[in-house]
A protein has these predicted regions:
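RNase H-like, Mg2+-dependent phosphodiesterase core
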Residues: 1-202
Length: 202
C-alpha cells in the first residue's frame, strides 16, 4: 500500500490550504486511472467532485484531508502549515510504510517508521495515488471557495478559486480584504508589488 500526498490552494490569496493523502494498493489506483482519473488540473470541477466522492466512499481506500486556514497561514507561514499537514496525514495512517509527496522537497521531515519516503516532481502525473490525492484536495478547495463566494460575492471566489486573477486583483483594489483573505500574501499587480493592509476589510 502506497500513500500519495498532494495539496491545493498553496498559491491562493484567500481561503485554506488543503492537503490530502490517499493510500491504497497499486492495482486499485491503476484501476482508477484506467477509468479516467487524472491529476486535478486535467479534470473539470464536476469530475473532480465525482472522483473525490468515489475515492472517499471506496472501502479499500484510506484518505485524509487536512485544512490549514488563512489565519493559520498568516500566523505560521505556508511552509510550516504544509509540513504540519503532511505530518498529520502520515502519522494518521501508521500502517502505511511507503509515502510519495508531489514536489521536489521533503521539507527535512523524517518518519523513522517509514520504509520509503520520497518527493516526486510532477508526481500527480506519475503516481496514481498522488493524482487521487490531488483530486481530493482540489475538490475540497473548490467546495470551500463556492461557499466563500456566497459570503463575499464581490471577489468571484467560485470562479477564481482564490487565485490572483485580474478580476480578483481589481476586486481587492476596490473592496480591500475580506475576512477570508490571507493578509500575509503579496499581490503582483500590473505595475508593482503591493501588500494589502489587514485593516482593509470587506
Amino acid at each position: 500500500m502506497l500513500l500519495g500526498i498532494d495539496e491545493a490552494g498553496r498559491g491562493c490569496l484567500a481561503g485554506a490550504l488543503f492537503v490530502a493523502g490517499v493510500a491504497c494498493a497499486n492495482h486499485l489506483a491503476q484501476e482508477f486511472v484506467a477509468q479516467g482519473l487524472k491529476e486535478s488540473k486535467q479534470l473539470s470541477r464536476a469530475k473532480r467532485f465525482s472522483w473525490a466522492q468515489k475515492i472517499q466512499a471506496h472501502k479499500d481506500i484510506q484518505s485524509v484531508v487536512v485544512a490549514k486556514s488563512a489565519e493559520e497561514i498568516d500566523s505560521k507561514g505556508l511552509s510550516v502549515c504544509l509540513q504540519e499537514a503532511i505530518k498529520e496525514i502520515v502519522l494518521g495512517l501508521p500502517q502505511v510504510l511507503s509515502v510519495c509527496i508531489d514536489g521536489n522537497t521533503l521539507f527535512k521531515l523524517h518518519f523513522p517508521h517509514l520504509k520509503s519516503f520520497q518527493a516526486v516532481i510532477k508526481g500527480d502525473d506519475k503516481i496514481p495515488q498522488i493524482a487521487m490525492a490531488s483530486v481530493l484536495a482540489k475538490a475540497h478547495k473548490d467546495q470551500e471557495m463556492i461557499e466563500l463566494d456566497k459570503l463575499y460575492p464581490a471577489y468571484g471566489f467560485a470562479t477564481n478559486c482564490g487565485y490572483g486573477t485580474h478580476t480578483h486583483v481589481v476586486a481587492l483594489a476596490k473592496h480591500g480584504y475580506s475576512p477570508a483573505h490571507r493578509y500575509s500574501f503579496k499581490l503582483k499587480s500590473t505595475y508593482r508589488w503591493t501588500r494589502l493592509k489587514p485593516e482593509h476589510r470587506y
